[in-house]
Regions:
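Acidic/histidine-enriched alpha-helical segments
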Residues: 23-32, 67-85, 96, 149, ...
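An aromatic/glycine/proline-enriched structural segment found at the starts
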Residues: 106, 110, 141-209, 311, ...
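Histidine-acidic residue clusters that define the catalytic metal-binding segment
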Residues: 100-140, 172-179, 208, 307, ...
Length: 371
């Protein structure tokens, strides 16, 4: 606490070279093998197979032996302060801050953010301490996808990352101790002189985490609401049928810390309330009337396509491996989950939406035209 922003500042400073190479020399080494190398809490390299060994050597050098030069720290800190100064008073930023304050109880770390004050308080030593505590092999997953054998990939990783050691105890965050705010309807309005229409977000915290039995059903419900573009339920009713909005979307996010569900739309100020009432009516219908089988099967097909199509690329395969590993999910568990998705019935989806969503408990944030 009091040093929010140290993580992003550390990421920025890692681009300033290593103990072996200064920033320009490091870039020259990666250019020599036509590699794209990026460093930070998310790190990686894209390179042809023949230069994988050298790319991994440079990647390990950047991750395990960053120089953290004082001059680079001063420049990076000033850059971050300038960015915060420019963004802090933007209406969209103020709206996002107000939303988090309304959604989460005092003491919840999700309310914390980098400010000019917290960033100004960060020292060069703070960056080194953060690096030592947060960049650890026991918090890292490395995925290699490409034209090589698994044995060669493992050998190269062990050669350059095998001596990476963790010091001290791994931090463990007790998520069950997070304070919970009782769900209740609130409205926050922020004026924006640059807007010609209102941008509205309805958002609520859901009583679930990754692995919840209702996860598959909520994914399908979100796909039905907004996953088919102009053919989605929200767009068809709020835009095409009623003419209340210019655009409409929904979002369902879930991880180990919790879950949120939101509906967002852009409308004329006079239609904000009517659009919300229509969106809430859709949710209530999903809670009270089972979907037609055809609609549910179409949503399943869309969701399955989003799962399968990215696996046609190296990046997609790598992201899939990392996502599953970070979630602690085995291939067998992933297969079981998708079998559950495909087997879900309209009645099961209806029951899950009724259990988890509270249409009367949205925090409403309105970014509206005005000075």
């Amino acid at each position: 606490p009091g040093r929010e922003g140290v993580a992003s500042l550390t990421n920025e400073l890692m681009r300033w070279g290593t103990i072996s190479y200064d920033r320009k020399a490091y870039e020259a080494e990666t250019d020599a093998i036509a590699a794209n190398v990026y460093l930070g809490n998310t790190f990686g390299a894209t390179v042809t197979s023949e230069y994988l060994d050298r790319a991994m050597q440079l990647l390990a050098d950047g991750m395990l032996r960053p120089a953290f030069p004082p001059a680079g720290f001063a420049v990076s800190k000033m850059k971050q302060l300038q960015t915060l100064s420019a963004a802090e008073h933007l209406p969209a930023v103020q709206a996002a801050i107000a939303q988090d304050q309304a959604l989460y109880a005092p003491g919840d770390p999700r309310r914390r953010r980098a400010t000019i004050e917290t960033t100004a308080a960060i020292s060069h030593a703070d960056v080194r301490r953060w690096y030592a505590s947060a960049f650890r092999p026991d918090l890292t997953t490395i995925s290699i996808v490409g034209d090589m054998s698994p044995g060669r990939a493992l050998s190269i990783v062990e050669r350059y990352f095998g001596n990476w050691k963790a010091f001290g105890k791994r931090s463990r965050f007790n998520r069950t101790s997070l304070p919970q705010r009782a769900p209740t309807q609130r409205t926050v309005t922020v004026k924006s002189p640059s807007l010609a229409q209102s941008q509205v977000t309805l958002k609520e915290v859901l009583p679930m985490r990754l692995g919840d039995p209702d996860y598959a059903a909520l994914l399908l419900a979100n796909t039905i609401l907004s996953g088919e573009g102009t053919g989605s339920l929200l767009f068809k009713e709020l835009r095409i049928r009623d003419g209340y909005v210019y655009s409409a979307d929904s979002k369902f996010d879930v991880d180990e810390d919790g879950a949120t569900f939101s509906i967002s739309y852009a409308s004329d100020p006079k239609d904000v309330d009517r659009a919300q009432a229509a969106a809430v009516a859709i949710l209530r219908r999903l809670q009270s009337v089972p979907l037609d089988d055809v609609e549910l099967e179409r949503a399943k097909a869309l969701l399955a396509a989003r799962r399968i199509l990215p696996l046609d690329s190296y990046d997609g395969i790598a992201r899939d491996v990392l996502t599953r590993t970070n979630a602690g999910e085995t291939p067998a568990q992933a297969d079981a989950f998708w079998h559950k998705v495909l087997a879900l019935t309209p009645v099961q989806l209806q029951a899950a939406v009724r259990r988890k969503l509270q249409p009367d408990a949205f925090v409403r944030v309105i970014l509206e035209p005005g000075a």
